[in-house]
Amino acid sequence: MLRVENLSIRRGGKTVLEGLELELRPGEMLGVLGPNGAGKSTLLGALCGELEPAEGLVLLDERGLDDWPGVARAQRLAVLPQSSSLGFAFPVEAVVGFGRLPHSSGRERDVQIVAEALAAADASHLAGRSYLALSGGERQRVHLARVLAQLWPGEPGQVLLLDEPTSALDPLHQHTTLQAVHDFARRGASVLVILHDLNLAARYCDRLLLLQNGRPHLLGTPEEVLRPEPLRAVFGLEVLVQRHPERGHPLIVAR
């Protein structure tokens, strides 16, 4: 479990994230929403230890991130940044296999996990190809498989952080990707995902954090957060909110 207490981040003498209290629960998928510059990627940088808090704490299983040895932390915490690039023609299986480096599970088990992670990311058909020959969306799915393999099969105490994992994907694979992440959370891992698409967030996330100007504006269920008033206040967007006729979650339509 990952817990944040009174978190503030300063960059270049400016406070870019302030006053955040957050707990990622086992088995939960939490979405982070907000306009450009709201502090979403800054939050992810703080949660993975890349950015040092000016105030507050980030605790992984009640221990500060710096108190974890590198390998032990990598066995519990995986991060998919907004963009991941490799300049070498590694086979797809090797790229996904990088996620197994913190583990000592043996080659046979690692090969099995790589195959299972590729299947979960709907990328099994990419096996055997060179990473450099893939499209942007295919590369994004391979990197998703890599971070899934790092924590596979997912269990309480593990945390997966994803920064816009659907940004390069077509509509079908936006859904298959978020369904894979949702299924991974249901195995017990805690998942935080940064998204821009409000309807995808409504469909797949258990709770949503709405950020505005580096501060939390609202934290709650999709039904609590995705209402006309908060969306107008944060995005300046006039919307209609309806109930999905089949699934029951909020359905947002711009006026």
From Swiss-Prot:
This is Hemin import ATP-binding protein HmuV. One of its GO terms (cellular component) is plasma membrane. The gene is hmuV. It holds the Pfam family ABC_tran. Belongs to the ABC transporter superfamily. Heme (hemin) importer (TC 3.A.1.14.5) family. PANTHER family: HEMIN IMPORT ATP-BINDING PROTEIN HMUV. Keywords: ATP-binding, Cell inner membrane, Cell membrane, Membrane, Nucleotide-binding, Translocase, Transport. One of its GO terms (molecular function) is ATP binding. The keyword Magnesium does not apply. Residues 2-238 form the ABC transporter domain. The complex is composed of two ATP-binding proteins (HmuV), two transmembrane proteins (HmuU) and a solute-binding protein (HmuT). It is found in: Cell inner membrane. It comes from Pseudomonas aeruginosa (strain ATCC 15692 / DSM 22644 / CIP 104116 / JCM 14847 / LMG 12228 / 1C / PRS 101 / PAO1). ATP binds at residues 34-41. Part of the ABC transporter complex HmuTUV involved in hemin import. Responsible for energy coupling to the transport system. Its EC number is 7.6.2.-. It is a peripheral membrane protein.
